[in-house]
């Protein structure tokens, strides 16, 4: 692919091509308070115009290197968690670490998007890498569960920030027709080797060193691997400041006067630009809503009977509604502009993400346990089956991106992906309990999971580009954060529902079907797959255990398929976004009417590549 494809501005469309007339930019005087570009967005816009071919080559090389190191760190450090658990001898407390990490990741998306819009993309890369390095350093030196959880908070913020800023950076420097390609390549080319080689690295580290060094080494490796990306961005950012500013930036006020007192500057930064009150409402609302969902996950569904959990859930919803009201009517620089929420493409894409990740979590939480107990697979094959969805997703994302590039439309790939997800889940529903004690083999499960992964790769890649195309350039980071957060929220809810179904289904079935002499072991068998696997395959006890696992996993599969079914209707609400010069110009300048006027008499010319 030619490097010209990376350019955010259609080649020749804004400057030299007489057939495509540049629309008048929207100046601050023409914008509402919420539409005025924030400092970080202005900086990103000036940087976008200042990139050279050589600079983009170096920047994307650095992006691939940084992404590779972060993905290797993520997948290899998962191996060390049981060792940390054993060191603290507080296995039950580790679930609290997962809860805090999940909540932190979801809440971090909109906060990081806002910080990126205020301070800039390079600055957010730096902040994210620092947070992740500090998190790994705390992991390496932690002496108790509290410190381990603190490390998890830093690591969660860092990894979430890097992933989001990576996608926003790609959106900044690509036009719509090439965006899907470049947004999928960094992860697609690095996740697959990290997925399989990360565990090999972890095992090699454990042979010669303890788990603490396994965490700590990434606090060194990741910042080093990120120097090329961050250094290149800072260099071109500094160079862009020295160049004459384009008219649309030169004429815009800086949102504050240099003669203002320090307290006015602090007020403008904290209250207006960062919307501190909105941030507090958002964090409180999400935390109160997600804590009970997370704590009632795979093993504590009985806690729903506690009044405090219901109260937290209700209060969280109320505060989140208050946040939406504040953002809509009061905030000058809202986290989520109201016009974005009411856009049907954005709303539909977020609903697709919520339902898809709800289905995935409902089915997958206990799937590897089911594979090892009822399907008699070892831990290795069970992991390979589960990972097949991730691999298929990454590969399909690349193909979907290129298909979008050549068809110059997004909706058709949503229409392709969603039915594939439903089909794959339908096959899984059949495979988990085929009747007469039969279940699918490894190849069948891999095929079904791969169908879901391919479907997700198609619809999610197309949906992300679609939602980014429906907002102005200054709102790309926010809409991307909302899109990712919606998927995470769906996953959190799905985990809780899976725990409730599993806990209400498996124990009664075990108590009912186990041989009389083993009925008192029902709770022990439910609580540990190790205990369940101790019973020899083919014995009455193991046959009863296998049947109970099959029936319980089938219930989860039914719930997952039911969640996917509405997606077949929701997908029609996404607009068919044309990936053309005209759409790119609208995104760049936010002046839809001027662009339409300049392109009257026919569709805009397609972006050149």
UniProtKB/Swiss-Prot annotation:
Classification via InterPro entries: MFS (IPR011701), MFS_trans_sf (IPR036259)
Coiled-coil regions, chain positions: none
Pfam families, alphabetized: MFS_1
Keywords per UniProt: Ion transport, Iron, Iron transport, Membrane, Transmembrane, Transmembrane helix, Transport
Functional summary from the UniProt entry: Involved in the transport of siderophore enterobactin and so has a role in iron homeostasis.
PANTHER family recorded: MAJOR FACILITATOR SUPERFAMILY, SIDEROPHORE IRON TRANSPORTER 2
Name of this chain's protein: Siderophore iron transporter mirA
Organism: Emericella nidulans (strain FGSC A4 / ATCC 38163 / CBS 112.46 / NRRL 194 / M139)
């Amino acid at each position: 692919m030619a490097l010209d494809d990376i350019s955010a501005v259609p080649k020749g469309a804004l400057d030299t091509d007489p057939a495509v007339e540049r629309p008048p930019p929207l100046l601050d005087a023409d914008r509402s308070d919420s539409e005025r570009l924030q400092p970080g967005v202005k900086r990103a816009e000036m940087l976008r115009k200042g990139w050279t071919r050589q600079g983009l080559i170096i920047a994307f090389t650095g992006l691939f290197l940084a992404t590779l190191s972060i993905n290797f760190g993520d997948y290899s450090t998962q191996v060390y968690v049981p060792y940390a658990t054993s060191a603290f001898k507080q296995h039950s407390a580790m679930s609290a670490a997962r809860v805090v990490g999940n909540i932190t990741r979801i809440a971090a998306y909109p906060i990081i998007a806002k910080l990126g819009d205020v301070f800039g993309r390079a600055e957010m890369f730096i902040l994210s890498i620092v947070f992740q390095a500090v998190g790994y350093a705390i992991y390496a030196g932690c002496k108790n569960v509290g410190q381990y959880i603190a490390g998890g908070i830093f690591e969660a913020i860092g990894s979430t920030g890097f992933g989001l800023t990576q996608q926003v950076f790609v959106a900044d420097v690509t036009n719509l027709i090439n965006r899907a390609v470049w947004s999928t390549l960094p992860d697609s080319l690095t996740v697959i080797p990290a997925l399989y080689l990360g565990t090999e690295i972890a095992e090699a580290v454990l042979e010669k060193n303890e788990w603490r060094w396994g965490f700590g080494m990434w606090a060194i490796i990741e910042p080093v691997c990120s120097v090329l990306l961050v250094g290149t961005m800072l260099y071109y950012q500094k160079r862009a400041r020295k160049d004459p500013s384009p008219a649309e930036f030169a004429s815009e006020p800086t949102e504050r006067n240099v003669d203002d007192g320090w307290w006015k500057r602090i007020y403008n930064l904290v209250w207006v630009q960062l919307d501190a009150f909105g941030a507090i409402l958002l964090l409180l609302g999400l935390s109160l809503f997600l804590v009970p969902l997370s704590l009632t996950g795979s093993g504590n569904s009985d806690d729903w009977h506690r009044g405090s959990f219901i109260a937290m859930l209700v209060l969280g919803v109320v505060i989140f509604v208050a946040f939406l009201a504040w953002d809509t009517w009061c905030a000058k620089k809202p986290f989520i502009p109201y016009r974005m929420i009411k856009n049907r493409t954005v709303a539909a894409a977020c609903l697709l993400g919520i339902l898809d990740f709800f289905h995935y979590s409902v089915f997958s939480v206990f799937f590897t346990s089911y594979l090892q107990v009822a399907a008699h697979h070892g831990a290795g094959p069970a992991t390979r089956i589960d990972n097949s969805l991730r691999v298929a997703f990454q590969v399909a994302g690349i193909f979907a991106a290129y298909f979008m590039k050549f068809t110059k439309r997004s909706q058709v790939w949503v229409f392709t992906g969603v039915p594939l997800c439903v089909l794959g889940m339908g096959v899984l529903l059949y495979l988990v309990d085929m009747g007469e004690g039969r279940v699918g083999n490894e190849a069948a499960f891999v095929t079904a999971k791969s169908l879901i992964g391919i479907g997700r790769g198609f619809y999610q890649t197309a949906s992300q580009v679609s939602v980014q195309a429906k907002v102005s350039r200054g709102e790309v980071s926010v809409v991307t954060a909302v899109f990712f957060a919606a998927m995470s929220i769906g996953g959190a809810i799905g985990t809780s529902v899976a725990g409730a179904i599993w806990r209400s289904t498996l124990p009664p079935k075990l108590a009912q079907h186990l041989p009389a002499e083993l009925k008192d072991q029902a709770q022990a068998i439910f609580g540990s797959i190790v205990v369940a696997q101790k019973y020899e395959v083919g014995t009455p006890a193991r046959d009863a255990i296998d049947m109970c696992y099959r029936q319980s996993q089938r219930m989860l599969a039914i719930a997952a398929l039911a969640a996917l079914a509405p997606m077949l209707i929701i997908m029609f609400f996404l607009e068919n976004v044309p990936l053309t010069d005209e759409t790119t110009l609208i995104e760049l300048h936010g002046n839809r009417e001027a662009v339409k006027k300049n392109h009257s008499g026919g569709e805009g010319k397609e972006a050149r590549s």
